[in-house]
Amino acid sequence: MTDLFSSPDHTLDALGLRCPEPVMMVRKTVRNMQPGETLLIIADDPATTRDIPGFCTFMEHELVAKETDGLPYRYLIRKSG
């Protein structure tokens, strides 16, 4: 099985940050990415389990993968075009 998290185009370390900081940083980072590029987000705030998927839905980006069974949480999103 391929590890989807192994080769993102960009990585955002949001460990230790609390809502709303992680999603604000994701928004700023994604804004500077090209369509089709991927972003790995590493976080430990439980609010990200709802905020990151919600951000992807609202902004129409693809939530490629998420791993929220244990800490740290990992999310891989692809910027829409």
From Swiss-Prot:
It comes from the Bacteria. The active site is at C19 (cysteine persulfide intermediate). GO terms for cellular component: cytoplasm. The keyword Lipid biosynthesis does not apply. Pathway: tRNA modification. SUPFAM superfamilies: SirA-like. It is found in: Cytoplasm. It holds the Pfam family TusA. The keyword Cytoplasm applies. Its main location: cytoplasm. One of its GO terms (molecular function) is sulfur carrier activity. Keywords: Cytoplasm, tRNA processing. GO terms for biological process: tRNA wobble position uridine thiolation. Interacts with IscS. Belongs to the sulfur carrier protein TusA family. PANTHER family: SULFUR CARRIER PROTEIN TUSA (PTHR33279:SF2), SULFUR CARRIER PROTEIN YEDF-RELATED (PTHR33279). Sulfur carrier protein involved in sulfur trafficking in the cell. Part of a sulfur-relay system required for 2-thiolation during synthesis of 2-thiouridine of the modified wobble base 5-methylaminomethyl-2-thiouridine (mnm(5)s(2)U) in tRNA. Interacts with IscS and stimulates its cysteine desulfurase activity. Accepts an activated sulfur from IscS, which is then transferred to TusD, and thus determines the direction of sulfur flow from IscS to 2-thiouridine formation. Also appears to be involved in sulfur transfer for the biosynthesis of molybdopterin. NCBIfam families: PRK00299.1 (NF001423). This is Sulfur carrier protein TusA. It comes from Escherichia coli (strain SMS-3-5 / SECEC).
